[in-house]
């Protein structure tokens, strides 16, 4: 899943993904995808050297998270994945303004440029996540503009303090 959020795909993987009729990844819009890094700034998608899985494990190690038992069939959840979206037409407008977007599979949308409004929308949601869960607990925050509707994937470690144990 992390490879999909970060689009760490080669051409073969990309083509295989698009064989599924429910998928709609536009190669010509992939360059418009971005993520917000730990510094709160916009960066190209996949700019971080470490993958989501590695960053998640590092954060869990920092927190001292341990599964119930190594051989247990039931394990505690260690992260939450949020997908933020909105009205299809409105999110397209935020992303591309009045530019013509062709949503047909295989269409050439290489002329499109990302509009500032989509970056501000993403930053606002990032700020909300940081305030709610803590900036250090945001493992990944990717914005996809290469699918049918623009949306955000946020992976967070929901850290809280237990009243009885204080941990």
Would you name each region that the model predicts?
Residues 1-167:
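N-terminal nicking endonuclease/strand-transfer module with a His-rich metal-binding environment
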């Amino acid at each position: 899943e992390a490879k999909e959020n970060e689009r760490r795909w080669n051409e073969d993987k990309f083509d295989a993904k698009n064989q599924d009729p429910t998928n709609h990844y536009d190669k010509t819009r992939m360059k418009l995808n971005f993520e917000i890094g730990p510094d709160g700034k916009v960066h190209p998608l996949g700019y971080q050297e470490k993958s989501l899985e590695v960053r998640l494990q590092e954060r869990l190690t920092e927190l001292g998270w341990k599964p119930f038992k190594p051989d247990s069939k039931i394990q505690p959840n260690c992260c939450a994945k949020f997908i933020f979206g909105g009205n299809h037409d409105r999110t397209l407008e935020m992303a591309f303004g009045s530019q013509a977007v062709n949503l047909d599979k295989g269409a050439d949308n290489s002329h499109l440029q990302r509009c500032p409004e989509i970056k501000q929308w993403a930053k606002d949601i990032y700020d909300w996540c940081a305030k709610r869960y803590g900036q250090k607990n945001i493992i990944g925050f990717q914005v996809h503009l290469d699918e049918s509707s623009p949306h955000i994937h946020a992976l967070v470690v929901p850290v809280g303090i237990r009243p009885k144990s204080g941990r």
